[in-house]
């Protein structure tokens, strides 16, 4: 037994040495001089979280620049303070002369009420599936992957399909809308403070989709450029406790490939939600830091005819134990939900349990008035279990949010919620009405859901190569890609890149109603 353990330790030491050598070699080969702004050492992709793992995000003709520093969290002084004060940067690209550019005034960056809300309200009764087939294999080991590819450019190497859960990144960001009934409920509140609390509960609720640790073991499929996802929810599905129902509609599109950026807008009868998220990551030895550039903006359309505008930057999330051990994710530090109409705000603190305390789940919310004063109201609870109205930091009122159900046997079914499991299903609401770009129609993702991983792998390779071919053709012609459904707004004052949903005859929902899908590429026909 002693010899066996010694052999295992020897193999592990060898892998760690190879991993360190690979990172050090890649650093010397590609690393420019570091600026003094770097607060601590990390492995940082200059693009997105998915590009490290997906070959479709790499460019075979041009190596992607990555910054690699090999140093563990324990070796880095002040890492706890850094986690609480992380700010993501934005990436702004040029806009073609023919593109419509929206004003960057704060009000115009928020979503307005569309002229038409078709197909709302949705009163249909839809029987959605409550689960998907269980995973048939374990996800690959990162150590084994690195060991196998020592000396290679990792940005051009594709992880196998078994590293993915059978959903798209487009669907993952759509999970923010699982608790949209909180926005309906916010509109019904008479006091501005109460509306702020409901919107804040909605902002916190998005993290609950990762409460099962197995959800951290795999990543969603990286969408192709121009790939889309629409989501419709009916009146019965969104009524909720205190909600007004009527359902909502959502469209998400991948608008940029390098760096990956999505654009999304959801509309209910009395609210609109918009975001242009660009996920990025840094590796810190044992953990990965996941940040999202792109503020969430929500507009509530109040019964008196006025609009109330809110916004927030999504908190940083850490994926723990990346290389070995039990993986899990946790939001860290703080975030603030601002009432941009009044100046009031809600300060959210995600409380840490320390280096050896395990996952931090506690959440404390404090409300500040437009003059910066506190009135003692807020929320307490956990991002995994629910939030309750509080006074002076102690529970004093009803629970206004609790997470929804998980699929049966969630640990063996990708750790999914019931809501997430329903997203890749084509229901009567979508059948025959989806554009050719909708990720539900993507063959490799569908085959992966069915457990046919070898076939999914073949399709993934074909789709990636077709995307590279399209990009080469555009580069040869000197053309710039223009998204079909969103147009870039003028940069916000802080440089944030914001995309706005087109309306009128060029709008997604108008094209859907006609069923023509003008100017839509058949991305999956390869």
Language model: regions and residue ranges:
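Extended acidic, Ser/Thr- and Pro-enriched interaction/regulatory segments
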Residues: 1-184, 188, 193-526
């Amino acid at each position: 037994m002693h010899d066996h353990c010694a052999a295992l330790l020897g193999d592990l030491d060898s892998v760690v040495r190879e991993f360190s050598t690979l990172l050090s070699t890649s650093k010397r080969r590609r690393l420019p001089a570091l600026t003094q702004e770097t607060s601590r050492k990390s492995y940082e992709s200059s693009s997105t979280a998915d590009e490290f793992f997906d070959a479709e995000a790499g460019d075979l003709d041009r190596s992607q620049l990555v910054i690699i520093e090999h140093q563990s969290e324990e070796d880095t002084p002040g890492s706890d303070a850094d986690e609480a004060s992380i700010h993501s940067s934005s990436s702004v690209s040029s806009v073609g002369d023919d593109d419509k550019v929206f004003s960057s005034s704060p009000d115009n960056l928020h979503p307005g009420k569309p002229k038409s809300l078709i197909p709302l309200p949705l009163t249909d009764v839809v029987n959605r599936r409550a689960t998907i087939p269980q995973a048939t294999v374990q996800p690959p080991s990162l150590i084994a992957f690195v060991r196998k590819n020592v000396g290679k450019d990792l940005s051009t190497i594709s992880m196998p399909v078994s590293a993915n859960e059978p959903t798209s990144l487009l669907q993952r960001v759509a999970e923010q809308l699982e608790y949209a009934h909180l926005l309906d409920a916010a509109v019904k509140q008479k006091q501005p403070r109460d509306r702020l609390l409901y919107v804040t509960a909605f902002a916190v609720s998005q993290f609950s989709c990762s409460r099962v640790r197995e959800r951290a073991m795999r990543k969603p499929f990286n969408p192709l450029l121009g790939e889309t996802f629409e989501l419709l929810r009916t009146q019965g599905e969104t009524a909720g406790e205190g909600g007004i129902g009527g359902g909502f509609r959502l469209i998400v599109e991948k608008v940029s490939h390098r760096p990956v950026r999505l654009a999304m807008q959801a509309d209910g009868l009395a609210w609109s939600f918009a975001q242009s998220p660009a996920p990025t990551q840094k590796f810190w030895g044992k953990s990965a830091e996941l940040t999202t550039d792109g503020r969430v903006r929500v507009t509530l359309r109040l019964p008196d005819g006025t609009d109330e505008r809110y916004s927030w930057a999504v908190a940083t999330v850490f994926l723990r134990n990346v290389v070995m051990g039990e993986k899990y994710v946790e939001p860290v530090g703080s975030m603030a939900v601002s009432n941009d109409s009044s100046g009031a705000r809600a300060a959210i603190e995600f409380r840490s349990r320390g280096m050896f305390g395990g996952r931090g789940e506690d959440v404390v919310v404090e409300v500040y008035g437009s003059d910066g004063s506190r009135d003692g109201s807020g929320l307490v609870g956990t991002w995994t279990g629910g939030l309750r109205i509080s006074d002076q930091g102690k529970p004093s009122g009803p629970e206004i949010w609790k997470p929804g159900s998980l699929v049966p046997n969630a640990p063996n079914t990708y750790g999914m919620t019931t809501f997430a499991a329903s997203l890749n299903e084509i229901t009567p609401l979508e059948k025959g009405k989806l554009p050719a770009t909708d990720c539900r129609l993507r063959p490799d993702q569908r085959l992966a859901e069915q457990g046919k991983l070898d076939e999914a792998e073949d399709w993934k390779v074909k789709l990636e190569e077709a995307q590279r071919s399209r990009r080469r053709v555009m580069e040869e012609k000197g053309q710039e890609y223009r998204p079909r459904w969103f147009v870039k707004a003028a940069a916000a004052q802080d440089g944030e890149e914001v995309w706005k949903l087109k309306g009128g005859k060029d709008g997604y929902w108008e094209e859907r109603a006609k069923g023509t899908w003008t100017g839509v590429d058949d991305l999956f026909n390869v």
